[in-house]
UniProtKB/Swiss-Prot annotation:
Disulfide bonds: none
Pfam families: RuvX
GO cellular component: cytosol
GO biological-process terms attached to the record: rRNA 5'-end processing
Enzyme Commission number, as recorded: 3.1.-.-
Keyword Protease: no
Family matches, as HAMAP family: Nuclease_YqgF
Keywords: Cytoplasm, Hydrolase, Nuclease, Ribosome biogenesis
Group of enzyme by EC: hydrolase
Protein name: Putative pre-16S rRNA nuclease
Chain's role: Could be a nuclease involved in processing of the 5'-end of pre-16S rRNA.
Organism superkingdom: Bacteria
């Protein structure tokens, strides 16, 4: 099995929230991510229909989901919701899911919007972009890693 470090893979990342879901797209070869869209999290049917359209359009090799944690690393009240969302993505779309600690991603996105380096109105997508960039930055330059393999 080949890891992403040595090959090109398209990735979609999600910053799951009870009202909105931020989405970003990235590429493992260029190790770059960009904000894509903010989906309204109206209900399960709407949520997965919207995600399905993005998956059909972008044809990702894998998905990344931000995992909310407290600053001390303990699970957040929303941690289980994000885990369930990631498991549902895996079950519905048969794509591998990796969870990334998303501590401070929204804070960083807000700071970027205030400074003008990030897009206003896209806070959740900007947070997803930060989550995905953290994942991409963590890919080993030396070759495949069991932690980041797509099956």
């Amino acid at each position: 099995m080949s890891g992403v470090a040595g090959r090109e893979a398209t990735l979609l990342a999600f910053d799951y929230g009870e009202k909105r879901i931020g989405v970003a797209v990235g590429n493992s070869l260029t190790r770059s991510a960009r904000p894509l869209v903010v989906l309204q999290n109206r209900n399960r049917e709407y949520r997965f229909e919207a995600v399905g359209k993005l998956i059909d359009e972008w044809k990702p090799d894998a998905l990344v989901v931000g995992l909310p944690m407290h600053p001390d690393g303990t699970p957040h009240e929303r941690t289980q919701l994000a885990k369930r969302f990631g498991n549902q993505l895996n079950g519905r779309f048969n794509l591998p899911v990796t969870w990334i600690d998303e501590r401070y991603s929204s804070v960083e996105a807000e700071a970027g919007i205030r400074s003008g380096t990030r897009q206003a109105g896209m806070l959740d997508a900007e947070a997803a972009c930060i989550i995905l960039q953290q994942y991409l930055d963590g890919l080993s330059l030396e070759g495949p890693s069991d932690d980041h393999e797509f099956r």
